[in-house]
Amino acid sequence: MSSLLQGVNLYLIGMMGVGKTTVGPLLAKHLGYGFLDLDGVIAKATDKSINQLFAEEGEAGFRQIESDVLSQVCAFTKLTIATGGGIVLRRENWGYLHHGLIVWLDVPVELIYRRLAEDTTRPLLQDADLKGKLRSLLEQRTPLYSQADLHITVQEGETPEDIANRIIEVIPNVLKPQASH
């Protein structure tokens, strides 16, 4: 697998609550890669929580910071990177993401809702109609998420280990070994 990937980063994309930050370290371990949570890097770099950044900078300001951090992170190799759910919204981010292998973790809204119903740390979810907000965000982002190299549909009851193993199994389908002449 390592020879097939040749150090190329893996970027996990998808809605908040799909398990990118949980699956990412497992995937990294399988590959002998490092793991980065982009939101964690942003929080550390700015010394502010994501909620604080949204409150102080607005979504547009946060998205700019996110792009700046992504541009720096993509210079490294052998990383599995969990991105924020909105990383796909800015065209410039796709230029960075395409330096690696993009994996979309696709989880049904019902399951995301159950995972996030009690979560007060997500700035885009401070909405009375949480399920409606999730549906709306997913509808808006699905055409963008679908540009990923790999589309992993997560089923109810699948463990993070199951998901990581499925990703490992399908990576060879999108990466062809370099032909030796």
UniProtKB/Swiss-Prot annotation:
EC number: 2.7.1.71
Molecular function, one GO term: magnesium ion binding
Origin: domain of life: Bacteria
InterPro entries: P-loop_NTPase (IPR027417), Shikimate/glucono_kinase (IPR031322), Shikimate_kinase/TSH1 (IPR000623)
GO CC terms: cytosol
Residues where substrate binds: D39, R63, G85, R141
Family membership: Belongs to the shikimate kinase family.
Subunit (UniProt): Monomer.
Protein known as: Shikimate kinase
Gene name in the database record: aroK
